[in-house]
């Protein structure tokens, strides 16, 4: 999370693969494959919970922009699923002469298959629970500012703004998330002073705290990694 808060394009996910290699002696490509499939499940949980919270918050008056975002979220999920199955089919049929590239692709496939069918219910439950708990952050901010908004709207606000971080344009969605959160709060007729107060507290919790404590942990982790022997698995 710390790396993703500093660099665009979700490059922090590659760093997670690097850490997996250092800690377990597994390849980076296997770690990236595991992170990729994790992101797909996260996106499924996010879009599903976003639709539920939007419907319960707005009933039949869900803003068309929100419906548009949900529609594109579903399209992205379907595209990723097709991409995964396409990769698995193609990778099982090709025979590469480059052994290093072949090892990278095989380990990536191994990472994609790390999720077993019998673990799916638990994984989906944890994803839903995780996103719901994260959504409570905004609701508690509402309470601290004496804003009379329901808990599901807090969850919806967090999910709708977090969805933009899945589009790796800026580090942690800087700029686009702020705009989205202000826009969402205006849907409930929150004035700009209240909306900006929510935004400042939200970013202090969801961004600057990660940068601060993440920097400390990054220093500790990297210092330990430098002491470990190198290996050459890809």
From Swiss-Prot:
The subcellular location is: Cell membrane
Q: Name one GO cellular component term.
A: plasma membrane
Q: Kindly indicate whether the keyword Transmembrane belongs to this entry.
A: yes
Q: Which domain of life is it from?
A: Archaea
Q: How does it sit in the membrane?
A: Multi-pass membrane protein
Keyword Cell membrane attached: yes
Q: Which UniProt keywords apply?
A: Cell membrane, Membrane, Transmembrane, Transmembrane helix
Q: Where are the transmembrane segments?
A: 32-52, 70-90, 123-143, 164-184, 198-218
The family this protein is said to belong to: Belongs to the UPF0104 family.
What is this protein's name? UPF0104 membrane protein MJ1078
> Can you name the source organism?
Methanocaldococcus jannaschii (strain ATCC 43067 / DSM 2661 / JAL-1 / JCM 10045 / NBRC 100440) (Methanococcus jannaschii)
């Amino acid at each position: 999370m710390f790396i993703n808060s500093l660099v665009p394009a979700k490059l922090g996910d590659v760093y997670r693969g690097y850490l997996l290699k250092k800690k377990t002696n597994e390849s980076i490509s296997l770690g990236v494959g595991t992170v990729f499939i994790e992101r797909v499940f996260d996106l499924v949980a996010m879009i599903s919970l976003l639709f539920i919270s939007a419907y319960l918050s707005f009933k039949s008056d869900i803003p068309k922009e929100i419906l548009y975002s949900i529609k594109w979220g579903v399209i992205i999920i379907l595209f990723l699923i097709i991409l995964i199955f396409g990769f698995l089919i193609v990778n099982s049929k090709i025979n590469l002469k480059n052994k290093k590239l072949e090892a990278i692709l095989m380990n990536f496939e191994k990472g994609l298959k790390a999720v077993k069918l019998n673990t799916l219910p638990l994984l989906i439950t944890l994803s839903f629970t995780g996103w719901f708990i994260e959504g409570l952050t905004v609701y508690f901010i509402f309470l601290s500012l004496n804003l009379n908004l329901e808990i599901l709207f807090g969850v919806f606000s967090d999910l709708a703004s977090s969805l933009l971080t899945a589009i790796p344009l800026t580090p942690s969605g800087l700029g686009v998330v702020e705009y989205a959160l202000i826009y969402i709060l205006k849907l409930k007729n929150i004035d700009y002073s209240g909306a900006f107060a929510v935004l400042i507290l939200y970013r202090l919790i969801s961004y600057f705290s990660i940068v601060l404590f993440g920097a400390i942990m990054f220093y500790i982790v990297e210092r330990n990694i430098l002491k470990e022997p190198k290996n050459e698995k890809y």
